């Protein structure tokens, strides 16, 4: 046995020398902490590294997670003798120490980390051989109603462990249309748009799906796979808009009054109403059972119909489905009397008016609903004043209100005016209206133009609209200021486009010819206009309009070089924001009145997204479009004459970008500062919110959440709360007092699905009164206690020195005074 071991060591040594491991560098070196990566499943007896011994070390010792796989020879050769398995242990933590001849550690031990790299040696496996679920008809497309889950023991951070789900077959398959779809990454099953519209439990109450899962992200021919079966029951969706409601106006019943109801499919929904029209007064409410009420009497004359939305939300305020449209029609009651068109309605009648001729029509109004009995009016003459030469000179059509002459006995000199009182009634109300009928002279004179030819007039085609270009005049010898003498001017020839009009002065009968529409040299350079003057009252029998009532006029329009004219003031186009570069996104058209060619250009393309064909006006994309950066995207289009004076005109082009799923999810806000108090007494959790910049309309985002790395699964778990919120929870309480960065993978379930990996920093720290306590360090510029004591002692020392100097100086001054006193007494002369 000993001989066999020595032989094995000798073979390794020879292999080691033959392959160059003995050279200092990549494969050999001094004893120090090191990390090695080795693929699992490789042949054993592979040399990993040669450690060099420094005297007095003569041999090496290996400890740690060797699993009887890793061995170190006395000479320092580290190798493994069996194939590694990442799924058994992904990391081996070893320690190597150098020993002297007596077996005493003289160097180390140092950590040696062996990381086992993954190979694709495990097939994915569904957690269940069969799944069952249910979905309601008309459920929102893309909203998951069931998840299938598979596991793969390979490393999820590599393609080996990345799973790809797909639907193999749908049974039954109706018209070759897929009603179901699956998120390739998460296994979330939802309805397609066709499934949302066409699923009907009355026709097909159940479906079966065969789902496959592949590893290698489904991108390799050598992928391992597994399949499972999914049985789906289609249930009726009771979240449906109710039938339109009719509510009688001005109801005197106690309010609120229940008028209809909506119901979500499951209990616990929170209901609300949304005023679609943003009315200042919204007279409806809904309770938490889904019953809808009118809260006050309605007035049909104020508003005859209401349209609003009923919304169902979950406990977090997120919509459960699309809102339902509620229609309420206000039913009319007869609560309005007829009204007269004016206090007094005036008509004129010629004294020789023929029997039965129409004098005029009295049109009363009723605010109740049109074309119903409530607004159906009857007319009746109740009084004629004066009754000369007899009563009953006039009659009125009962339902039309048209007044007619009943008897041919009118004479202006005897009775120039009649007053009628007319009763207008609906089925419940009556109103009196007053009509004044003026008897006027017979219309036996025609209008006569003062001249029959108003000559020629030359105008530029850009003459302003509203300009008066000509004054015409006709006279009438009938009774002044009556319908027999009033003159109306009409253009009967030469202006088929209606570019001109004539206004009449009622006091002078003067006609003013004005420009109503732009003149155009290109279509009407010369117009031969014919005017006709006539009265609003009919002429008496035997009198007809003749040439005296007609006049002519020639209008000559001169050319003006006009700018090109766009066919529209604003052009709009709608495209998906992910269209390929070079795609035609719209076009504009303009014409030059003079027929010149036009060159198109763009102005205000601040993002450089578009180009325009200068000849055809077709607009193309030249860069990636982004709805989130700007939609609608507004630019100006310039049309310029080619040649001539190069006049130009400008129109707007609005490009509406339809959203695609091109923004990965992210955290809704900065979550710096999340913490748990250390040590944990029980597992804890934190709630966070995700968002993205794509458009979600009513349904809002529906994210799914998972941990961003398989290495986090022992410490953390993440669970979905709703479409935007999730809970991060600890799996145990044994955390160190430090900051952890937890990676979260967020999938938006869109088409195509996008994922974002975000970081949540979570700190485990000591707490004081529920807050994270971090000891304050020394701050630059603030003295420490030692510094303060030093400053104080220095100050006292300086004061002491100053006092000592002062005292010494005082003492010296005293000594000097004493000497001077002594000397003075010694020289004083003696007296005898």
Curated annotation (Swiss-Prot):
Residues 809-832 are cytoplasmic. It is a single-pass type I membrane protein. The chain crosses the membrane at residues 788-808. Disulfide bonds: none annotated. SUPFAM superfamilies: Cadherin-like. InterPro entries: Cadherin, Cadherin-like_dom, Cadherin-like_sf, Cadherin_CS. GO terms for molecular function: beta-catenin binding; cadherin binding; calcium ion binding; integrin binding; proton-dependent oligopeptide secondary active transmembrane transporter activity. Glycans are attached at residues 149, 184, 250, 419, 456, 546, 587, 722. This is Cadherin-17. GO terms for biological process: adherens junction organization; calcium-dependent cell-cell adhesion via plasma membrane cell adhesion molecules; cell adhesion; cell migration; cell morphogenesis; cell-cell adhesion mediated by cadherin; cell-cell junction assembly; germinal center B cell differentiation. The keyword Cell membrane applies. Residues 23-787 are extracellular.
């Amino acid at each position: 046995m000993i001989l066999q071991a020595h032989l094995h060591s000798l073979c390794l040594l020879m292999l080691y020398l033959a392959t160059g491991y003995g050279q200092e560098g990549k494969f050999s070196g001094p004893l120090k902490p090191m990390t090695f990566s080795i693929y699992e499943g490789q042949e054993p007896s592979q040399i990993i590294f040669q450690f060099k011994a420094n005297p007095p070390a003569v041999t090496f010792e290996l400890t740690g997670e060797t699993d009887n796989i890793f061995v170190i020879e006395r000479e320092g050769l580290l190798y493994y003798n069996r194939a590694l398995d990442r799924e058994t242990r992904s990391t081996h933590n070893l320690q190597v120490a150098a020993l002297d001849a007596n077996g005493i550690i003289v160097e180390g031990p140092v950590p040696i980390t062996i990381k086992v790299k993954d190979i694709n040696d495990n097939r994915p496996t569904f957690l269940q051989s069969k799944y069952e679920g249910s979905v309601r008809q008309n459920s929102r497309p893309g909203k998951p109603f069931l998840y299938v889950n598979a596991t793969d023991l390979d490393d999820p951070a590599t393609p080996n462990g990345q799973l790809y789900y797909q639907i193999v077959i749908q049974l039954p398959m109706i018209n070759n249309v897929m009603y179901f779809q699956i998120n390739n990454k998460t296994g979330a099953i939802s309805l397609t748009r066709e499934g949302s519209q066409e699923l009907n439990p009355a026709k097909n109450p159940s479906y079966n799906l065969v789902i496959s899962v592949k590893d290698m992200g489904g991108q390799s021919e050598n992928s391992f796979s597994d399949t499972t079966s999914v049985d789906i029951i289609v249930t009726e969706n009771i979240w449906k808009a109710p039938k339109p409601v009719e509510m009688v106006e001005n109801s005197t019943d106690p309010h609120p009054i229940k008028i209809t109801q909506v119901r979500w499919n499951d209990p616990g929904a929170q209901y609300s109403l949304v005023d679609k029209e943003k009315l200042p007064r919204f007279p409806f409410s809904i309770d938490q059972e889904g019953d809808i009420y009118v809260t006050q009497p309605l007035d049909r004359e104020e508003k005859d119909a209401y349209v609003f939305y009923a919304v169902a939300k979950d406990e977090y305020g997120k919509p459960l489905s699309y809102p339902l449209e509620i229609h309420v029609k206000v039913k009319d009651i007869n609560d309005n009397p007829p009204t007269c068109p004016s206090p007094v309605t005036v008509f004129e009648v010629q004294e020789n008016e023929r029997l039965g001729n129409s004098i005029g029509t009295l049109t009363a109004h009723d605010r109740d609903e049109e074309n119903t009995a409530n607004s159906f009016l009857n007319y009746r003459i109740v009084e004629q004043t004066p009754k000369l030469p007899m009563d009953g000179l006039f009659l009125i059509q009962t339902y039309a209100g048209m007044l007619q002459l009943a008897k041919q006995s009118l004479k202006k000199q005897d009775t120039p005016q009649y007053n009628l009182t007319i009763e207008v009634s609906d089925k419940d109300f009556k109103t009196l209206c007053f009509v004044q009928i003026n008897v006027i002279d017979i219309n036996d004179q025609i209008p006569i133009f003062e001249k029959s030819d108003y000559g020629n007039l030359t105008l530029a085609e850009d003459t302003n609209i509203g300009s008066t270009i000509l004054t015409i005049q006709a006279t009438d010898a009938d009774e002044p200021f009556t319908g027999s003498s009033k003159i109306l001017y009409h253009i009967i020839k030469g202006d088929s486009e209606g570019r001109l009009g004539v206004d009449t002065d009622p006091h002078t009968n003067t006609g003013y010819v004005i420009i109503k529409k732009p003149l155009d040299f290109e279509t009407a350079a010369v117009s031969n206009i014919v005017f006709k003057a006539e009265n609003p009252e009919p002429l008496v029998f035997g009198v007809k309009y003749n040439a005296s009532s007609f006049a002519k006029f020639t209008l000559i329009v001169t050319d003006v070089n006009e700018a090109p004219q766009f066919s529209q003031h604003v052009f709009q186009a709608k495209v998906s924001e992910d269209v390929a570069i070079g795609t035609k996104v719209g076009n504009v058209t303009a014409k030059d009145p003079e027929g010149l060619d036009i060159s198109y250009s763009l102005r205000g393309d601040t993002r450089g997204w578009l180009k325009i064909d200068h000849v055809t006006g077709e607009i193309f994309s030249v860069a990636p479009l982004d709805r989130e950066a700007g939609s609608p995207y507004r630019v100006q289009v310039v049309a310029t004459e080619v040649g001539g004076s190069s006049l130009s005109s400008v129109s707007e082009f609005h490009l509406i970008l339809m959203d695609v799923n091109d923004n990965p999810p992210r955290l809704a806000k900065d979550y710096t500062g999340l913490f748990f108090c250390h040590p944990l007494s029980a597992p804890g959790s934190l709630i966070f919110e995700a968002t993205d910049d794509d458009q979600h309309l009513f349904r809002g985002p529906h994210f799914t959440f998972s941990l961003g790395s398989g290495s986090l699964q022992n410490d953390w778990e993440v669970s979905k709360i709703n479409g935007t919120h999730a809970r991060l929870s600890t799996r145990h309480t044994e955390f160190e007092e430090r900051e952890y960065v937890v990676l979260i993978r967020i999938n938006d379930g869109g088409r195509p699905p996008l994922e974002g990996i975000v970081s949540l920093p979570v700190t485990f720290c000591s707490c004081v009164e529920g807050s994270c306590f971090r000891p304050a360090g020394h701050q630059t510029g603030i003295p420490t206690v030692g510094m303060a004591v030093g400053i104080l002692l220095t100050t006292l020392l300086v004061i002491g020195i100053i006092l000592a100097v002062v005292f010494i100086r005082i003492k010296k001054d005293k000594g000097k005074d004493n000497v001077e006193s002594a000397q003075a007494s010694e020289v004083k002369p003696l007296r005898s």
